[in-house]
Structures are given as structure tokens and as C-alpha cells.
Amino acid sequence: MLLSSPTNEHTIELAQQYAQGEVCYPVKFIYGHMQELAEKNADYIFMPSIHTMKHEKSGVKHNYGCVYMQTAGRLVAKNLRLEERGIKLLSPVFDLDFGKKAMASAMVQTGTELGFAPPKCMAALLTGSAAVKKYTDSMEAMGKELLDSLRPDEKVLVLITRPYDMSDPVLNMQIPKLLLERGCKLINLEHLPGHSIDISDEYPNIYWPFGQHILSGAKLIKNHPNLYAVYLTNHGCGPDTMLSHLFRREMGDKPYLQIEVDEHYSPVGVITRIEAFLNSLEHHKTVSAGSAIDIKNVSVKHYDVKRLDTDTAPVYIPYLGLYSAMAADYIRSEYGRDVMIMSEISEKQVELGRTMTVTKEYVTFTGLLGNVLETAETAGGKFNVVIPENEGSEADGVFARVISALIEEKGLADRVGIISPMLESLPEKAADTQKLFCGMLAADIAYSVPRDRRSEFICEHIPDEAELTELAKRASLIRSEGKTLRITGTPMSIYSLGSHILDFLEDKGYILRYMPLSEYFRFLWNDSGAECKKLYEIMHKISQALGNNSPFAADTDVLINAADERFKGFAGANGRYRYAVITTEENCSAVINITPRYENVSFVHELSGMSCPVPIHRISVDGDINESELSSLNSFLYYI
């Protein structure tokens, strides 16, 4: 058996040579380690895919690995051409949320691929599981022993990060060594009983187990007068862009050091920051607890989630093109609330949001935050904002909770509430799912016609099925001449942040086929196991009525099969649907894919070698009207 070397200069060199795209630093190192093993003539390379993970105190439906953990092994193997080189990838899919049986099945299958009998595989698995538990218990016991022995004025630093950052000599930037050389007492997150803390009442939708552990660790550190955090995050990590805000919230006025791991980091800069932090701690007086400390006795505050059916305050909803008016009508008619549509996200709002950012947050988050803050400045009295959640595993499902935390930080929590319906649960929990779906279809129909005729198809109220069918038949009669461009991406990138791009294209006379939001949600709900047969029947009927103007897939099964081919079981930002739409699109001149800059799912799609039957141009929006971006788009259009 071969192990790759501890990360060294050669690993970094290989990573820089083979890694593609703006992936996070740890994923870049996977390229280096797997290429090293390939150069050593390995027959097999073991790199599992982490789909879900177990976390005992979690309250979410599924505890997901990030989008890279779900896909990295397969994507890196493809880019390194391992199969062509005669090297087999062993990449069992770990679905630890489904219990020990699922884990055992995945590992036994891997063992049998290597020629071992199932009983021998099970024995090895049990031995390994026992060793992990023994290690976990011993680490927490060591931590307790240290904390019990501390003098009242002693300070202990706790390294907070993911396990792979903790142990890797490059990813941890030698910080443990630097701290120990300076005489610090140092432990890490594994020495604290973070797994026994239930934070789900305060953070109900943190679906990353490492994120849950980091936040429970933050509570333990905040609660113990002798503990101070050194928090390492990863450049390019979507989850870290959200967790950093919540970690800061937990620390409050207690000093801590946060350093972002980046391939361009300066060792001198790291040392300077460490020494400045240690110097500040010398002047920070440790407050004696006065008695024995129960470190687990942490404060977990109830997160007050507002509800449409019980909270009577006026409601604001984010701008999402024509879909916003349909959503507003739905809320008014079903819940009797006063509803206002927020303005389209502007450059000014993005800049306002950036006054509270800490790293490279997606512009969909930054713009939405700025939009909420500006609304709070102009709206009088109390109001609620609808910011949907999803079940994971991209950063977007946590936007609502983080924006709520930042509203609290700004002192606006008494005026501004957040309503965050779970998107996957809408078929079960919406007051009238079919009506909501018909509202999406109404906007889909309006977007199926050219801009100069669109006003004829905009509805004031949500039509019923029969009215939708007649509307679609009318739309089918409109004929347009010119090249057709398929518009794909994330809904907010297309319908709010990317409107200047769409105007640019329509000004040039291109026919745009917009990604239909009804199909987007129907696919998401199908993936989550919801019963959507009736909704599909209505959508199919509208698609047929639209004829050649239909933006819908002719056969939904084609989309599902395309998604399963490369991203079976994948969870994150409806990435399966977005991938399938692009890779099956044939009835247009080109695809324009609009996504937020730095979005991890977009990078995963690119790394997958996503092929499109027609030319594709990718645009990463970042909240401004970028002339070079439009120039690049113009050049692309010239050749189609």
C-alpha cells in the first residue's frame, strides 16, 4: 500500500500544474497528492466521495459534505486521466446520514473490488471504527485533563478548522509550530466536546457537519475564560464565507485570530499577525469564572423564524424579474399580507452589502444583504423579508440565517424579521402549491415572447390552469426572427443581477430562451422526493401549448438521466438541473450561462468537463456592469 507524502514543495508544484479553476486550496492539493500516487505507478487510488456525514446533534434532514467533497475524487481522476493511464479510482460514496449499514455496504464493495471476501472487509471496518472512536474519546479526555489543570490566569489557544487543515503542514501554514515556539499552550477543536453540543435551535439549517462542529466549538471557547480561538478558513470555500460571519457572532467581544489559508500567503505576514494577536492577548485580562467551569453549559439562543401564516407585519420580497409579481400576488391572496417587491439589486446595494463582508462572499449574498439594509433605511416600522432556504449543500441555503445575524449586528432585529421557507418543502407546506406553480408558469410564458411583446402577457393575478393554457396558445402565435440564445444559471444571477446582460442581448435582436423557473423547481422537488405528478402534467400541457416558443425540455427524463450520468445524488444549488439543461440543449444557437463569481457549484460543473452541444459562454456576475465582460460576450456572439 502506498501513501502520498505529507504535503511538500513537490505536492504544491503538482497541484499548481494540474489543478483547474478557482477551487479552494485543499481541493488543489488533492490534484497534487493523486498525481504523486499516479507517478508512483499505483494500481488503485482510494479517494471517497462524501455525500452525507453523521452528526449526532444535528437537526437538519441531511448533513452534507460540501460540493467539492461530493465530487472531488471523480473530477480530479478525470482531469488526471487516471483511467487512460491504467489506474482505477476507488471512490465509494459515503452516505453516513443513512447509518452504519450504508457505510458498511460502500466499504465492503470497495474491499471486494480489491479481491477481499466480505467477512474480511467487515472485520477491517469494525477495527477501523473502533480505532476512530478510541481516538475521539482520548482526544476529548486529553482536553478535559488540560482544562482541569489550568490556573485562573492561564490562556490556551484553540485551533479551529477542519481536520484536513489541522493536520496538513502546508494547509495549517505551520501555525501550530509557530504558536508552540512562542510558548503558547495549544489544543485543537478535537480536544473539546463539540459533538455533544446541540446548536440546532439557534442555527437550524447548518447542513455542513464541520460547520456545526466549528460553531459548537466557538460556543465552548466563548464560554471558557481561559480559551481563545485561532480560526483557519480556506480561500475559495463557499461554506467558510457564511461560517465566518456566524463564528464572529459567537465570539462577540472576545478576541480571536482568523487567518484565511491561501496558496499566495506570506509566511512573514502570518508571523506578524500571530505576534500582534499574542501581544493583544497579553493585555486582555482573563475573567475568573469563580468556580468550577462546566464547559458544556453554553448559551443556545432560540432563532425566531418569522412565518407568513402567523406574523402580520408587511412583507418584502426580493426582486426576481416577473416572478416577483406572481410571488407577491400569491402571498397577498393566500396569507392576506401587505406585500412589497424590493428593488432590483443595484451596484450601490452591492457596495452597501460589502461594508459587512469578510471574504469573497457570492454577490448573490452581498447584493441581497445590501438590498435588505437599504430597505431598512427607507421603510418605516416593522417588516419581514422573504429569503428562502434550501437543504444544501451550497452556501445559498444559509444566506437567510447569516443575513439575520448581520441584521442583529446592525441593531435592526427589532424592526426586520426574516421569513425563510424551505424550498424543498414547498410541495408539502405551501398553502396552495399548484397556485404557486401556476404563478411561475405565468412568468415563464411571458418570458417566452420577445421583450417588445412581453407586456401583453404579464398577468396581474395568478391564472388558473385553463387561463394559462390560453395564454400559452396566444404566445405560441408570436414568431421571431433571429438567433436564439438559451439563458441558464442561478435564478438571482439571471433575473436580478444579470438584467443588464439580458438587455444587452435583446437590444442586439437576439431571441432569448430563459431558464423556466417552474421547470427548475419541479426538478428540485423531484430530486427531494416530493410528489409532483400533477404539476408536471400542467407544465407539460403549457409546454405543448407554447409550441416552438417553449423553453421547457421535451422530456424531463432526459434531464434526469443527464444529471445522473455525472452528478447522481449530488446536492447543491440545484446543480443537477443546471448541469442537465446545459448538456442537453440543442435547439438554440448558443448558451449563455450566468452565475455568481466564486460559486463552488459553477466550478464543479467546469471541472466535470461539462460539454454543451452548442457553443457556451460563461459569465460570472459580481455586481457591476463590466465593460470587458460585455466586450468578451460581443466577441463570442460574433462567431456563432
Regions found by a protein language model. Give the residues of each.
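An N-terminal assembly and electron-transfer interface module characteristic of large anaerobic redox
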Residues: 1-640
